[in-house]
């Protein structure tokens, strides 16, 4: 089965979907051959992968991407608490030091859907519904990643923020300040004063301000304005915006999956992805990092002997079953440089 054959099969399907009657006739005939459904399936998988890669996910702007080897709970380890380097006098032994280890757990899970393509649908000219199937499935995969990642910021029932992560014991209990210049500045100052287990000051990483759509323009106005104008008595005073460029604004509609009354006012301050202390991780399984599309070979055998082409449909219901699978997981792991406020 060559790449050329796969491409030709998909192009035939594409022309038939566009209303080419000759292509429709050729496709109906081709569905009775044993290899055409396989070729078409491979073509879908190739187009699905291309469409998937072309979509830029929002979650990648505030969560760190990682891979796992299996479905078992995974441990993300950090070596913390070292005391730094000490002066070593001439001809003396280097001083020993210990690391403390902090562990955070997360897990990848399997998601999917079956889709049935029937002979009747082709004959009855209903191919148009499948013309952009790869785009639809690619978007569904990206949507899944987005909801899984955003849900890590929420509790299990999505009725509030994740209070197992945002809590007083972690130094990031939910606040109730509306998003303003003052509250954002105070939040940045709060996370900038973090220390490690030995009391050593930590260097603040780049930060992202993650907001729902209702706070988008308010957030952008706060951090994108180069100057601020205010009135002092009868005088208009112009000053530099000290928050300009201080954080990167990320707007994630998936935050509105929360049913909390203040979901549209809730804002998060998180470390940028791929920093030393990531707040969130989004996990994929190694070797299965993109959506997988397959067909089901369950058409049975003829009574008189001989195999039946996949294109003639399954034994049970005459459908050609395609199945898409995507493996992903997400979790909140390190609370060090995080802040959340439900607004007021």
PLM region descriptions:
Residues 197, 202-206:
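Short gly/pro-enriched beta-turn/loop segments at secondary-structure junctions
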Residues 113, 117-197:
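Alpha-helical scaffold segments that mediate packing/assembly in large oligomeric complexes
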Residues 103, 122-128, 201, 312-315:
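Exposed beta-sheet edge/beta-hairpin loop segments within beta-rich domains
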Residues 1-34, 336-344:
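Intrinsically disordered, low-complexity terminal tails
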Residues 108-112, 204, 315-317:
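Short, solvent-exposed loop/turn segments at the edges of secondary structure
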Residues 169-193, 208, 214-344:
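Sequence/fold signature of self-assembling virion shell proteins
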Residues 28-111:
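Assembly/oligomerization interface modules of large self-assembling protein complexes
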Residues 154, 205-212:
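A glycine-rich phosphate-binding loop feature that marks nucleotide/adenosyl-phosphate handling sites
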């Amino acid at each position: 089965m060559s790449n050329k054959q796969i491409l030709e099969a998909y192009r035939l399907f594409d022309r038939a979907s566009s209303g080419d009657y000759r292509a429709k006739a050729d496709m109906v005939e081709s569905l009775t051959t044993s290899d055409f459904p396989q070729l078409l399936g491979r073509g879908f998988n190739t187009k699905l992968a291309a469409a998937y890669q072309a979509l830029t996910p929002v979650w990648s702007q505030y969560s760190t991407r990682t891979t796992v080897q299996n479905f078992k709970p995974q441990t993300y380890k950090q070596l913390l608490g070292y005391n730094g380097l000490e002066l070593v006098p001439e001809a003396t032994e280097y001083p020993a030091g210990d690391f403390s280890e902090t562990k955070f757990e997360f897990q990848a899970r399997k998601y999917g859907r079956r889709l049935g393509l029937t002979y009747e649908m082709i004959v009855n000219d209903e191919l148009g519904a499948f013309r952009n199937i790869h785009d639809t499935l690619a978007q569904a995969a990206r949507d899944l990643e987005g909801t899984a990642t955003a849900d890590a910021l929420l509790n299990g029932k999505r009725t509030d923020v994740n209070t197992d992560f945002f809590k007083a014991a972690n130094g990031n209990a939910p606040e109730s300040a509306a998003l303003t210049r003052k509250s954002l500045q105070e939040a940045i100052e709060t996370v900038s004063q973090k220390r490690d287990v030995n009391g050593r000051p930590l260097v603040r990483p780049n930060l992202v301000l993650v907001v729902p759509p209702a706070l988008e323009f308010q957030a952008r106005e706060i951090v994108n304005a180069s100057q601020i104008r205010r009135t002092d008595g009868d005088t208009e005073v112009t000053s530099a915006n000290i928050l300009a460029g201080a954080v990167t604004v990320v707007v994630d509609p998936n935050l509105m999956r929360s049913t909390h009354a203040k979901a549209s006012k809730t804002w998060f301050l998180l470390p940028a992805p791929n920093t030393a202390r990531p707040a969130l991780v989004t996990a994929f399984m190694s070797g299965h990092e993109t959506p997988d599309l397959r067909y089901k070979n369950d058409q049975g055998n003829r009574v008189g002997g001989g195999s039946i082409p996949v294109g003639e449909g399954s034994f049970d219901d005459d459908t050609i079953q395609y199945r898409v699978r995507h493996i992903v997981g997400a979790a909140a792991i390190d609370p060090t440089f995080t802040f959340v406020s439900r607004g007021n």
